[in-house]
Amino acid sequence: MRGRVKNYILEKIREHGAIHMTLIDPEKTTPEVAARIAREVAEAGTSAIMVGGSIGVSEAMTDEVVLAIKRSTEVPVILFPGSPTALSRHADAVWFLSVLNSQNPYFITGAQMQGAPIVKRYGLEVLPLGYIIVGEGGAVSIVSYTRPLPFAKPEVVAAYALAAEYMGFQFVYLEGGSGGEPVPPKIVKMVKGVTTLPLIVGGGIRSPEVAKELAKAGADIIVTGTIVEESENIRETIGRIVRATREGALERSRE
């Protein structure tokens, strides 16, 4: 059914106030490990699993990880492709993203042009996403030729998010970069104040406290990835972040 994953995401946000998604990078895991991670994070309450991130990922690698995840859990699998080669016909949907503050047109429209026919051929549900890199940005800013937007200029980040809405994107994503500093709550709050789009925040989120503050500030979706690669007890770690995310959204609703 067209729009099934989008409707699922929006319904989960309505139900919980804010939700959590787990990012699994095929380059940093094996299908067997990915399946175990997926099962544990799903049991902990994550609402969807994103697959992707790195640029050196082939379709075969993505296929193997996606299929392993889908055999182990029923939560939706959404592709988060670092390049057009990282698409899989077996996923439930794809974040069809444009890096809005890239200085290289390839990451704004070029890769999207290359990937669009593949997405259509595979029949993937498309989730149009305006992707904005802020703060240090980490490796993703280097790879995508992006000048990250400084934390000290939240109004510029908000303007990009508003532009994403006016350009027709259905979601907006604030990326702090893997392993870097998380996006500050003040930026999240300002962005949420100018756009009606569901707001995704990821990068550098390593604790329930940070997840709670970001959800309280306006994040509708919290994404974590590195933390599951490092955690010795994935179910407990993600469970705490899921609960904190929902608590933050509840506090926001009471303000």
UniProtKB/Swiss-Prot annotation:
This is Geranylgeranylglyceryl phosphate synthase. It is an enzyme of class 2 (transferase). GO terms for biological process: glycerophospholipid biosynthetic process. InterPro entries: GGGP/HepGP_synthase_I, GGGP/HepGP_synthase_sf, GGGP_HepGP_synthase, GGGP_synth. It comes from Thermofilum pendens (strain DSM 2475 / Hrk 5). Its main location: cytoplasm. Its EC number is 2.5.1.41. Its cofactor is Mg(2+). Keywords: Cytoplasm, Lipid biosynthesis, Lipid metabolism, Magnesium, Metal-binding, Phospholipid biosynthesis, Phospholipid metabolism, Transferase. It is found in: Cytoplasm. One of its GO terms (cellular component) is cytoplasm. Pathway: Membrane lipid metabolism; glycerophospholipid metabolism. It comes from the Archaea. It catalyses: sn-glycerol 1-phosphate + (2E,6E,10E)-geranylgeranyl diphosphate = sn-3-O-(geranylgeranyl)glycerol 1-phosphate + diphosphate. Prenyltransferase that catalyzes the transfer of the geranylgeranyl moiety of geranylgeranyl diphosphate (GGPP) to the C3 hydroxyl of sn-glycerol-1-phosphate (G1P). This reaction is the first ether-bond-formation step in the biosynthesis of archaeal membrane lipids. Sn-glycerol 1-phosphate binds at residues 173-179, 203-204, 225-226. One of its GO terms (molecular function) is phosphoglycerol geranylgeranyltransferase activity. Belongs to the GGGP/HepGP synthase family. Group II subfamily. Mg(2+) binds at residues 25, 54.
